[in-house]
């Protein structure tokens, strides 16, 4: 076994031991609660690829923690204002949201799943099979905040284990996702607060099932999570937050109607 494989296996074991400990000690609804509303912000918890050092929450490191839970707080406030969807509001500690691992059967209770910093993620074969099952059964995955060809390669390495038989394609400006409520055919890169990193050209990509349903919405070379997180930050451009809210609403409505 290579050193990188050993490190990833160790990180995965540590992640699930920690998740299990939190379940047992606190009964934390973020980790083990059932749905209490039509829509919860469900964030995917995953192990990092070897060498990742991004993100921190609750004493645990992990790229999945990026923007947590400010992004949830602001986005769910926006969805409540902009739609009539029965939405579970989230506070700054993440209460009201859900933290979901792919080994948790509760993943099937949430039709919309958000994965951030997927240029840092690692899915083993069991998790890849579970994600495929989730998506084939009607789930919708939105991935966000990864940049450049190196991070793209890490993302696709795991995604190819999920769908070795399906291609990733560019979304055309006429795709229903971009028009289901707001018309978003004039697409603009949504930057992180610190500006773009390795990537300069934004891409809206996706993976479809055999019936043409979009299962995975891929935001590449952009950072919608930062736009939500910094909605009240005077240093972050308000038009970008407004645009990121509109994209999120379109993704939500598409996922709940397809």
Residue ranges and their predicted role:
Residues 5-21:
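Bacterial N-terminal signal peptides
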Residues 22-112, 118-119, 223-224, 230-258:
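Aromatic-Pro/Gly-enriched surface loop or interdomain linker
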Residues 41, 107-152:
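Short alpha-beta junction capping motif
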Residues 45, 79-86, 117, 139, ...:
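Sec/Tat-exported extracytoplasmic proteins
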Residues 49-56, 150-230, 240, 245, ...:
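An acidic, glycine-rich "communication" segment
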Residues 72-76, 128, 132, 152-156, ...:
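Extracytoplasmic/secreted envelope proteins and their assembly/folding machinery
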Residues 85-98, 143-146, 166-174:
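Surface-exposed patches in mature extracellular/periplasmic domains of secreted proteins
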């Amino acid at each position: 076994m290579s050193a990188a494989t050993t490190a990833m296996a160790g990180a995965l074991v540590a992640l699930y031991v920690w998740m299990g400990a939190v379940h047992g000690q606190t009964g934390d609804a973020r980790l083990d609660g059932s749905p209490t509303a039509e829509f919860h912000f469900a964030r995917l918890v995953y192990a990092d690829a070897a060498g990742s050092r991004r993100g921190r929450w609750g004493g645990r490191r992990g790229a999945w923690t990026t923007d947590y839970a400010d992004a949830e707080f602001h986005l769910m406030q926006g969805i409540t204002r902009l739609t009539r969807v029965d939405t579970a509001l989230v506070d700054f500690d993440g209460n009201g949201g859900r933290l979901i691992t792919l080994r948790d059967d509760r993943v099937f209770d949430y039709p919309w799943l958000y994965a951030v910093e997927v240029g840092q993620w690692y899915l083993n074969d069991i998790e890849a099979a579970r994600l495929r099952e989730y998506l084939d059964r009607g789930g919708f995955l939105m991935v966000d905040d990864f940049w450049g060809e190196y991070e793209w390669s890490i993302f696709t390495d795991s995604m190819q284990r999920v769908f070795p038989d399906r291609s990733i394609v560019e979304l055309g400006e006429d795709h229903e996702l971009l028009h289901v409520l707001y018309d978003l055919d004039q697409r603009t890169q949504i930057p992180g607060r610190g500006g773009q990193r390795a990537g300069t050209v934004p891409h809206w990509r996706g993976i479809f099932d055999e019936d043409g349903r979009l299962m995975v919405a891929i935001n590449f070379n952009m950072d919608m999570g930062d736009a939500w997180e910094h909605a009240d930050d005077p240093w972050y451009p308000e038009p970008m937050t407004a645009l990121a809210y509109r994209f999120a609403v379109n993704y939500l409505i598409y996922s709940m109607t397809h």
